[in-house]
Amino acid sequence: MNENLFATFITPTILGITTLPIIMLFPCLLLTSPKRWLPNRIQILQVWLIRLITKQMLTIHNKQGRSWALMLMSLILFIASTNLLGLLPYSFTPTTQLSMNIGMAIPLWLATVLMGFRNKPKISLAHFLPQGTPTPLVPMLIIIETISLFIQPVALAVRLTANITAGHLLIHLIGSATLALCSISVTVSTITFIILFLLTILELAVAMIQAYVFTLLVSLYLHDNS
């Protein structure tokens, strides 16, 4: 049992060398390219999920926004794979690190904003000042809209970090309680084990949902600037 509750969120190392890059590249092994004319069931499921997500996210985009299809699909598959990887025993979830999530959010957000200022600068600047704003409120609204714009990538990263971290903490706490109650009451420990099992199933759904939410928000930022 870990002495520190947050020890599971410390970046693992081997001989002082971080293993985070290896963990981040591991999901690529799960998405192999087909070697036969007839794909297996896993590959059929992958293609079906990619087509479904692509249809839902890219319907609102124009031709320029749809050029991001490969980026968005790679993003959602990467985040979902790393989230699910962290649910395995003795594993590590890279998305619990705020630095990594900010490193993903800021470049994507900045790319959409720069694309908006390059393609339609007047419309992008108009977002800072809604139409019909009273003159005394103009400076205040510009400051508020500017702050809200720069908060977007931070909120994107914090949302993913908080949801994944909270779920792992709950699993850790309930798992520790289950082990402690085994020597006290078998009935109570069985109930807590059932709760732990149901919570693990919920975390599987949360891992997929958070990957979808992160990618969907990036897609909405892209839609606003394309």
Curated annotation (Swiss-Prot):
Keyword Metal-binding listed: no
UniProt keywords, alphabetically: ATP synthesis, CF(0), Hydrogen ion transport, Ion transport, Membrane, Mitochondrion, Mitochondrion inner membrane, Transmembrane, Transmembrane helix, Transport
Reactions catalysed: H(+)(in) = H(+)(out)
One of the protein's GO biological processes: proton transmembrane transport
Keyword Coiled coil: no
Membrane-protein topology: Multi-pass membrane protein
Subcellular location: Mitochondrion inner membrane
Its biological purpose: Subunit a, of the mitochondrial membrane ATP synthase complex (F(1)F(0) ATP synthase or Complex V) that produces ATP from ADP in the presence of a proton gradient across the membrane which is generated by electron transport complexes of the respiratory chain. ATP synthase complex consist of a soluble F(1) head domain - the catalytic core - and a membrane F(1) domain - the membrane proton channel. These two domains are linked by a central stalk rotating inside the F(1) region and a stationary peripheral stalk.
Family: Belongs to the ATPase A chain family.
Subunit field text: Component of the ATP synthase complex composed at least of ATP5F1A/subunit alpha, ATP5F1B/subunit beta, ATP5MC1/subunit c (homooctomer), MT-ATP6/subunit a, MT-ATP8/subunit 8, ATP5ME/subunit e, ATP5MF/subunit f, ATP5MG/subunit g, ATP5MK/subunit k, ATP5MJ/subunit j, ATP5F1C/subunit gamma, ATP5F1D/subunit delta, ATP5F1E/subunit epsilon, ATP5PF/subunit F6, ATP5PB/subunit b, ATP5PD/subunit d, ATP5PO/subunit OSCP.
The protein's name: ATP synthase F(0) complex subunit a
Source organism: Osphranter robustus (Wallaroo)
Phylogenetic lineage: Eukaryota, Metazoa, Chordata, Craniata, Vertebrata
Gene: MT-ATP6
